[in-house]
Amino acid sequence: MLQEFLNKVKNPVLKDKLEAIFAQIQQEFPSLTTEIKWNQPMFIMDGTFIVGFSAAKAHISIAPETVTMETFAKDFKEAGYEATSNLFKIKEDQEVNWDLLLHIIAFNMEEKKGYEKFWR
């Protein structure tokens, strides 16, 4: 499923980053499942959304939901990532801040334990 998405990513730098991101998430959080919804790979816990990804021409968008974006706004800024209320972007010339990425996933998993809806 993830490979089908990756095969559509035309930018080889972004494709490599996404492959590494997906592999790290699967290693660190093996209980998460993956689904493709709205043409975006998403990591799901017990039927609830944890984080989603998309690839543009020159950046990766990572969407962890608004609550998480607000909670980590300062961290995204310090990492040099462009952010909106719903997502942050990793440009092709930026490194993945692994600590931050894994922290937001762990945060969402903890915050959404027992949550019964897909979105917050």
What is the role of each PLM region?
Residues 1-120:
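Charge-dense, helix-prone N-terminal extensions
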